């Protein structure tokens, strides 16, 4: 009589380590960012003649979103920021990498870097404490003539540069998007 041999593998069960409040908050912020990028991509894809892609993880020096319209010879590199605070910062290196990307695509006549901001409908006022507010979105066109600096967008849609601790208002144009948004042209 033949016997069937089988092997048994014994694995040690790993119990997930409890996450600290800081780790939970970081994970939530990252998820909000990915969701906002994904929303932008889906909106472009539903629009005629547009194609859009999320380009990768934060560890890779790529813009968050690349959107192209070959019919209109247009390309956007988009840096997306989302949050519950009253301001959303954009580091200078992220603006610079978006500019580097659009400069490589000579075939497109219209090449723009967009800073896409989404202020969620809940405002964080303390750890785990939120207050309802209006959801707002802003799509600002980076002016290539400006010096590249860290900048911040406020809930009312104003953009400020931050250099050596000095805050200076930047007057960036709002981009009229080819899809429906929660954009506000004035607060």
Residue ranges and their predicted role:
Residues 2-56:
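Acidic-basic catalytic patches of nuclease active cores, encompassing PD-(D/E)XK
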Residues 6, 27-32, 112-187:
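Domain-level recognition of nuclease-like catalytic cores that cleave nucleotide substrates
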Residues 37, 79, 94:
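Acidic-residue sensor for enzyme active/binding pockets
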Residues 44, 65-67, 74-84:
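Conserved catalytic cores of phosphodiester-cleaving nucleases, focusing on short active-site segments
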Residues 59-62:
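Short acidic/glycine-enriched loop/turn segments that link adjacent beta-strands
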Residues 70-74, 107-110, 123-125:
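Short, solvent-exposed loop/turn segments that connect beta-strands within catalytic domains
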Residues 86-115:
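Short, charged, amphipathic alpha-helix that recurs within catalytic cores of restriction-modification
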């Amino acid at each position: 009589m033949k016997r069937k041999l089988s092997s048994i593998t014994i694995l040690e069960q790993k119990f997930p380590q409890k996450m600290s409040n800081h780790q939970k908050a970081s994970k939530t912020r990252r998820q909000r960012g990915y969701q906002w990028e994904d929303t932008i991509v889906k909106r472009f894809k539903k629009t005629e003649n547009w194609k859009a892609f999320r380009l990768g993880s934060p560890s890779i020096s790529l813009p968050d979103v690349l959107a192209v319209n070959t019919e209109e010879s247009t390309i956007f590199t988009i840096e997306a920021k989302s949050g519950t605070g009253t301001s959303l910062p954009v580091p200078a290196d992220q603006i610079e990498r978006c500019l580097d990307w659009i400069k490589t695509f000579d075939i497109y006549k219209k090449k723009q870097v967009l800073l896409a901001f989404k202020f969620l409908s809940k405002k964080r006022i303390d750890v785990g404490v939120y207050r309802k507010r209006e959801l707002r979105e802003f799509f600002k066109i980076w002016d290539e003539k400006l010096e590249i600096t860290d900048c911040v967008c406020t809930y009312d849609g104003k953009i400020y540069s931050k250099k050596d601790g000095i805050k200076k208002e930047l007057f960036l144009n709002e981009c009229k998007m080819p899809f429906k948004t929660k954009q506000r042209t004035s607060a």
